[in-house]
Amino acid sequence: MIHLVFAAGIGLFGSPAFLSPQAPAEAAQDPATQRYDRLVAEANRATAAWSERVAALRTAELKGGDPVPADAWDSPLEVFIPRFVAAAKDYAGKDAAIPYLKWVAKTGMPMLGAGREAAKASLKELVTTHRASSSLDELEWMLGRMVYFFGEEEGRQIAAGLRTDSPNAKVRTWAVFSLNSGALESDPVDSPRYTAALKEVRAALAAVDLPMLAAEVENRVAVRAKFSVGMVAPDIAGVDLQGEKFALSEYRGKVVLVDFWGDW
């Protein structure tokens, strides 16, 4: 069952496909596009009704009524996943399948269970069969996690295919990041592999407008430069519970038993 994961997923991963602007009705001439538009419109209506229902239940709860039932938070889009998947299969291997596959990948990835599995399968179809499509940059962060989704060997093969075959520079940049993220995360910062990985990623980023990915890369670099194993930790000064000043550097070379509490 999908509860708050659905709502959280929207914030974490960006707006789902069903919230994207739709093409004007007069532009949707072919049957595949018309079918897609009808499904998206139906999903929109279901989402709007769900939002109103949950809002009403929440208002009643705040006024002293019963708590919102757990199943009220279930995604209204779970039932649409199989329908979009079926439509994609009807156009398998053709460009007409791409919008359906992207909808499933973006909408189902924040879900759990069958929704997420369908999203992964759709993502795989997009980055393999349809890797030459120029519109895959809409998948954004998913393109940089090929190893996470499909394992080391297959994930690297898929990313390499995107880097070679995609006509979209942003997609190729995400693929470069996917291929090098392991080295950036785990290799020693003074190793040739780390240096080469960082150089390749920065070169790819310099040619495109992907500010969030660029910031993520530089944040990783900064964190590892300051906090890698063997580095000297930044000094910290403070006042203890007895009002005495102390600094972290005073304890260098000593064995310290730390007993602490925190309130976050």
Language-model features: locations:
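Bacterial N-terminal signal peptides
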Residues: 1-17
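N-terminal leader/linker segments that initiate helical-solenoid repeat arrays
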Residues: 22-78
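Specific register positions within alpha-helical solenoid repeats of the TPR/Sel1-like families, i.e.
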Residues: 47-48, 105-113, 143-148, 179-188, ...
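Alpha-helical adaptor scaffolds
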Residues: 69, 102-164
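Generic helix N-cap/helix-start motif at coil->alpha-helix transitions
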Residues: 80, 93-99, 116-120, 131-142, ...
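Amphipathic alpha-helical scaffolding segments comprising HEAT/armadillo-like alpha-solenoid repeats
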Residues: 81, 114-124, 152-160, 188, ...
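N-proximal helix/coil linker or "cap" segments that precede and/or mark the start of modular domains
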Residues: 185, 189-252
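Short active-site neighborhood of thiol/selenol oxidoreductases, capturing the structured segment around
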Residues: 246-264
